[in-house]
Structure formats: C-alpha cells, structure tokens
Amino acid sequence: MLMVNYHNRIFRTVSNSENGETSSETEFHYKQIGNIVFAEYFGGSIKYGHLLGLVSEYGTIEMKYHQVNIQGEIMTGTCESIPEILDNGKIRLHESWQWTSGDLSKGKSIVDEQ
C-alpha cells in the first residue's frame, strides 16, 4: 500500500532553479492509478505540460515530463520528487530534475499541494 496518494491533488510551484520553466503561476493537476501517477500542468511560461511517473512505496515519484513553453518549444526532462507531509496535512514535493532537451542542465524545485 502506498504511503502517499496523489490522486486529484493540485500543486503549485513555490521555488525553482533559474534554468527551470515552472513558476508560482504553474498549476499541476495530479491523477493516480495504482502506482502510476500522471498530471497535466499549465501556467506562467508553460502553455501545456504532461508528466508520467511511478510512485514507490515511500511516495517518491520517478517521472518523465514534456511541455510546450510560451516560445512554442517542446521541452522534455526527468524528475525525482520526494514527498514531505506538512503540519497542515498537505504534501510538499522536493524535486530534482534534468532537462533531456535544450542545454541538458539540472535543477531543483519545490511544489506545494493547494
């Protein structure tokens, strides 16, 4: 049984590395079936994005993502998200990601459940 269930949860970016494209205007809508998690996201410099990943028994997500930015570019990457349960019971994800397109740089971000 999974310790964390992401189904029907909404997240927003609260911090991101300078080389990232998500911002506080970016909203993620998560769904989960078994240990498969997926989400649509949009807002800020992202017209539309999609992620697909697997959730471990500890709630960590290993995912791939692709998105279209406001410049009309398709950007892709990989991400590991580690959950933290906040005092209010909501989930915070600590993310380590890397572009698989563009400059292939790495970054870190934090997204909070709304």
Residue ranges and their predicted role:
Residues 2-22, 91-99:
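Tryptophan-anchored aromatic micro-motifs
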Residues 5-6, 30-36, 55-59, 85-90, ...:
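Short, solvent-exposed coil/turn segments at beta-strand boundaries
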Residues 12-16, 38-43, 63-68, 95-99:
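Short beta-strand segments that buttress and anchor functional surface loops
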Residues 24-27, 98-114:
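Edge beta-strand at a domain terminus
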Residues 27-54:
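N-terminal glycine/threonine-rich, aromatic-flanked beta-hairpin/loop signature
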Residues 38, 64, 93, 107-109, ...:
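Ligand-binding pocket scaffold of soluble enzyme catalytic domains
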Residues 48-52, 72-78, 102-108:
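A short, polar/proline- and glycine-enriched secondary-structure boundary/capping micro-motif
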Residues 55-91:
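Mid-chain, well-packed structural core segment of small domains
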